[in-house]
């Protein structure tokens, strides 16, 4: 399956009733600062360079970030942190990721998430993670030949990548690097959540 077909399938996904109801509710009720915006309020596809050597895996879209803008790590504090880091290392065209049509382009990098819908309290259930597993698994397979470095943001992303890749006995930690037998490098990091960045954890 090609990336464009996979992303179309993601957008149409209705496997998780709780998440479908939640993202629709958030899209209708909004928050005051975004009350005049039209929320995406659908599952969110991954994005970036289809021939990327750097694969970044996050947790899930944010309710008023990706769920609003239609692009993960866009329009929220986590997106600000990641966009700045990618720009400073030459992987992004600009240091900000505000909306789907802001001219922010990734170069040799691709960004995805374990769960494609924004979950309540940023915590997806085990069944929701399981339902989305097929999408991440396909993405990792599609990038098998080009990926050189994988960065997992948070333990959930780390655990799911290891499961898909058949990696055992690896332990999640912040700033931990694992050279893999296949030649790739796996880097685990805390997720750039507002709590982690504001408290200095990240």
Q: Could you tell me what each predicted segment is?
A:
Residues 2-198, 202:
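A polyanion-binding, active-site-adjacent surface
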């Amino acid at each position: 399956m090609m990336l464009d077909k996979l992303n179309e399938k993601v957008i149409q996904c209705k496997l998780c009733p709780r998440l479908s109801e939640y993202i629709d509710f958030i899209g209708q009720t909004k928050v005051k600062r975004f009350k005049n915006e039209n929320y995406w309020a659908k599952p969110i596809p991954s994005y970036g360079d289809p021939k990327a050597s750097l694969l970044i895996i996050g947790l899930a879209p944010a309710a008023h970030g990706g769920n609003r803008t239609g692009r993960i790590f866009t329009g929220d504090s986590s997106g600000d942190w990641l966009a700045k880091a990618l720009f400073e290392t030459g992987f992004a065209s600009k240091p900000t990721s505000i909306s789907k049509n802001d001219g922010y382009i990734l170069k040799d990098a691709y960004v995805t998430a374990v769960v494609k819908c924004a979950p309540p309290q940023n915590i997806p259930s085990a069944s929701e993670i399981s339902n989305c597993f097929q999408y991440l698994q396909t993405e990792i397979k599609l990038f098998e030949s080009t990926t050189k470095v994988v960065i997992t943001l948070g333990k959930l992303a780390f655990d799911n990548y290891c499961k898909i890749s058949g990696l055992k006995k690896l332990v999640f930690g912040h700033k931990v690097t694992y050279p893999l037998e296949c030649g790739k490098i796996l880097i685990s990091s805390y997720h750039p959540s507002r709590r982690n960045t504001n408290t200095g954890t990240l």
